[in-house]
Amino acid sequence: MGLLAYLLVVLLILNVFFAAVTVFLERRDTSATWAWLLVLTFVPIFGFIIYLIFGRKLSGKKIFDWKGQEKIGIQESTANQIEMIRQKEFPFSDSNVKKHRDLIYLLLVNDGAILTQDNEVELFIDGHEKFDALIADIEKAKDHIHLIYYIFHSDELGNRLMRVLERKAAEGLNVKIIYDAMGSRTTKKSFFRTFEKNGGLVRPFFPSKLPLINFRLNYRNHRKLAIIDGDISYIGGFNIGDEYLGLSKKFGYWRDTHLRVHGKAVYAMQTRFIMDWNSASSTNKIDYKPRYFPTFHGKGHTSMQIVSSGPDSEWQQIKNGYIKMINAAKKTIYLQSPYFIPDASLLEAIKIAALSGVDVRVMIPNKPDHAFVYRATTNYAGELMETGAKIFIYDNGFIHAKTLVVDGEIASVGTANMDFRSFRLNFEVNAFIYEKKMVQKLEDAFLEDILKSYQLTPELYAKRSLWIKFKEAVSRLLSPIL
C-alpha cells in the first residue's frame, strides 16, 4: 500500500470515529442524528467539514442577557400572571381568551410571554401596504427606531427605507438596525455608511469571525421586528427587498402576513430587540430605560402574547404553542407555510386532528424557493393527505405567510415556518392572538387565498414522475438538516 493510500485510509477511519463521537455526544433529535450520519458516511472528509460548519450545536455560552429586565418589572409581571392564572384569578378580557388559558399558561411558563389585552392590531397581506405604513410611522417617530430583519437588501425598497432612516438619524433620533449576516450576505457594508455617518447604528447578527468560515452559519436570526417610539411595532413575514413587493420575475406576487401593533405587546417586542442588539453588539449596549417603554394605555381589545424561540433553548416554544393549538382544535385548522417539514411530534398532532374529523387545510407554494426543501414539503403534504387533510397549492405568485388559525378563535402569525430549521436552528418570533375579530380577519384571508389556489388531490399527487419521487425521498431523508 502506497503512502497516499495509507493516509487516505487513516483519514477515513478518523473521519468515521470523530464524526460518530461528535454527533452522538451532542444532544439532538434522533432523525437529525441519522441524517448527519448519512452525510458523514457517504461524503467522507468533506462531509465532516460540512458538519463542522452547519451541524454543530451552539456552545453552552449564554447568548442573550436577561439582566436589567427587573428595572421594568418583566420578571415580576410574568410571575404575577403565572400565579394569577394558576389560582384562577386572572382578569381575562373575554370568554374566548379565558377558554384558551392553558395555551396562555404554557407560553408564559415556557417563554415568559406576558399576555397583553389592550392591543390595536392592523393586518397586512400585501408588501406595498405594509411598507407604506411602516415608512409613514418611521417618518412620525420622535425618539427612537429599532429594526431587525433577516434580509435587508440594498435594492429600490431598501434604498427608499434607508433614506428615511438616514434622515431620522440626522435629526438626532436613536436609530438602530440589526440584520442577519447570512440572510443579508449580498448587502455591502457601504450601504449603511451614510446612515452610520448620520449617527445611526447597525450590527450584523452572527457574522463570520474568520474569513470565509463561520461555525455559526447554520444558526440565523430570522426575526422581523420594527419598534417605533416604544408604542408601535411590526411583526410578521415580510423582509426588506423588492421581491417582497412582488417585483421578482421568479416569484411574482408575494403573499405574506404582517401585523402592526399598538399596545402593551410592543413592550415584549422591544425587549426582544434589546436582547438581540446586546447579543450582536459589543459596544453601545441598550439599557432598559423608560424611554424605550413609555407609559401609555392601548385603546384596542386584541389579547396576544409575543413568543420567541431559538437554538439557545431546548423547549422549542413556538412549536409547542403550535402543537397545543392543534390539539385544542374542534372544527378547523388552517395552516400556511412556504416550507412544510414538520417533525414527528407536530406531524402526529396534525394527523390526529385530521383523523378526528377536524377540517385540516394546509397551504404551500406552487414553486420552489429551495429545491430540496420544496420536495420535502410536497412529500410531507402527500403523507398528510392520507389522513384526510386537504392540501392547497397557492397559484397566485409565492405564499410566504406563516400563519396558523384554529377554530376561528386563536391564531399565530410571525416568522416561524413549519419546519425543523425554524424550530431548532433559527431565532424566531411569533404573535399568538386570542381575539375573535382579529382571528376572523386571518381566517378570511386564508379562505380568500384558497380561491387563488388549487387542491392537491391524491390522484394528482400520484401522477408525479419517478424522478420527482426520487427527489422527494432524498429530500425527506435529509429534511432534519435542511
Swiss-Prot record:
It is an enzyme of class 2 (transferase). One of its GO terms (molecular function) is cardiolipin synthase activity. Pfam families: PLDc_2, PLDc_N. GO terms for cellular component: plasma membrane. It is found in: Cell membrane. It is a multi-pass membrane protein. The chain crosses the membrane at residues 4-24, 34-54. Residues 217-244, 395-422 form the PLD phosphodiesterase domain. Its EC number is 2.7.8.-. Disulfide bonds: none annotated. One of its GO terms (biological process) is cardiolipin biosynthetic process. It comes from the Bacteria. InterPro entries: Cardiolipin_synth_Firmi (IPR030874), Cardiolipin_synthase (IPR022924), CLS_N (IPR027379), PLD-like_dom (IPR025202), PLipase_D/transphosphatidylase (IPR001736). It catalyses: 2 a 1,2-diacyl-sn-glycero-3-phospho-(1'-sn-glycerol) = a cardiolipin + glycerol. The active site is at residues 222, 224, 229, 400, 402, 407. Keywords: Cell membrane, Lipid biosynthesis, Lipid metabolism, Membrane, Phospholipid biosynthesis, Phospholipid metabolism, Repeat, Transferase, Transmembrane, Transmembrane helix. Belongs to the phospholipase D family. Cardiolipin synthase subfamily. Catalyzes the reversible phosphatidyl group transfer from one phosphatidylglycerol molecule to another to form cardiolipin (CL) (diphosphatidylglycerol) and glycerol. This is Cardiolipin synthase. It comes from Listeria welshimeri serovar 6b (strain ATCC 35897 / DSM 20650 / CCUG 15529 / CIP 8149 / NCTC 11857 / SLCC 5334 / V8). The lineage of its organism: Bacteria, Bacillati, Bacillota, Bacilli, Bacillales. The gene is cls.
